[in-house]
Structures are given as C-alpha cells and as structure tokens.
Amino acid sequence: MALQITHHKNFDIEAVGFSKLRKNKSGGKAVYLNVSDKKLYLQLPKLRSPYGLSTYTDDTTGKTSYSLDLSLDTDNTEAMELREKLTQLDELIIKTVVENSKEWLGKKFNEAVCREALYKPLVRQGKEPYPDTVKLKILTSSTGDFVPEAYSTSRERVGLDTITKGSKVTCIVDFVQIWFIDNKFGVTVRLQQALLEPSAKLPSFAFLGVDGASETQAEDEFVDEDEEYEE
C-alpha cells in the first residue's frame, strides 16, 4: 500500500478500515488497520515524554525492547483533541472485534467483556494526579540499532536516545495491527520518526567561570533569574 501521512487534525475515525484476519506460520493472528486501503500513518501533536525511552529485557531470550510513553496533558489542547480521537478509535476497534469475535477470538464475546477484560486500549488511563498516556513501540534492527529516525528542529539527525524525561517531541507513528494473544487484544503503535524540541534544562556541568572561563564569558552567558522557563 502507498504511504500517506495524516495530520492529527485531519484524522477521520470513520475512514479507518480493517483487513481480514491474517495468520502467520507460528499461529499468531493479526488484523491490519488502514485508511482508504493505505497504511495508517499519523502525525501526532507535540507531546511530553514523562520517562524518556523505556527498556525491557526478556530474561529468557536476553532481547531488549524499547518503547516511548507520551503524556496527554490536560493543559495541552492538541493533546486533548488527540485523546478524544484515540478514544473514538478504541471504541471502533472494540465494536469491530465484538462483531468478529467468533472468528478473531475463537468464541463470541459481548462488548462489556471485550472492553473491561480483553482489550488493552490506546489511551492508557493515568493514576491520579498523572495524565493519560499513549505508548509507542520502537523497532530495532538485527544489530540492535534503532530503526526510527530522530531529528532536531534544525533538521539534523540526532540519536533517539536523546529523548529524556520531560522531553517534548512530535512523532509520526504507524498503527500497525490489532494483535491477539490468549484471547486478549490490543493495537501495536510503532514510532517511525521523531522531532525533538530543544531542551530547556540546564546542560551537564553548567557552571560559569570555572576551569579558565573568563568573567566576560560568564557575563555573556548569565541567565536572568526573573526570566521564566518552561520546566
């Protein structure tokens, strides 16, 4: 399918379609999401990363996987608009799976059971006082390198691992598939590209006039204590 990126403001839930159930050689099952028969790529608004990159290492295989949580902060209007659309997509997915539950899940399930017990939603409810979040999967190559590309606002390539706690990032994501495991299901949302906003935090060892730094340099780099900076 041809590649087409949809801006979050133009994302029409009613345009989302679903493939037939696909099975792989290992017996795994998946249903692919699309828009007008094209893969569903979505450009998200600028969101805050509450943790930076998260890692998980499987004790059995030793393989490390990566993910990126993004906060749907209530003081971010675009984040709230995205939350509403993703919640609508959650509802559409639940209803579609219910309609096809005998084939996709192996038996008939009602909507309440699917919603409360079987489905892992796109919008993950935060515990008070923390906001809801959305989780992005990060693909790695056979050599362990990150597949998604990350850029600075000057369009220069940067390391994906420069996304740290509190970073603000604009992401292009791919809604890959609905996965089914042990009668539970959810959606894989995979990071494709990330645009990082410059950090407002102090750099490491930000002291002035140390190790040969001149007083003139210190004055030039002085920060007004009354100037407000976003945390």
What are these regions (language model features)?
Residues K9, V16, P203-F205, D220, ...:
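Short non-domain terminal segments
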Residues M1-S141:
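OB-fold ssDNA-binding interfaces and closely related basic DNA-contact patches used
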Residues R124-S199:
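Extended serine/threonine-enriched, polar tracts that run as long, contiguous segments within proteins
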Residues A194-G212:
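Short peripheral tails and domain-boundary helices/loops at the edges of structured domains
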Residues V210-E231:
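Acidic, Ser/Thr-interspersed intrinsically disordered low-complexity regions
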Residues P45, S54, V98-S101, P148, ...:
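Generic alpha-helix signal with a bias toward terminal, lower-confidence helices
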Residues K102, F109, S152, F185, ...:
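Generic preference for flexible, low-structure residues
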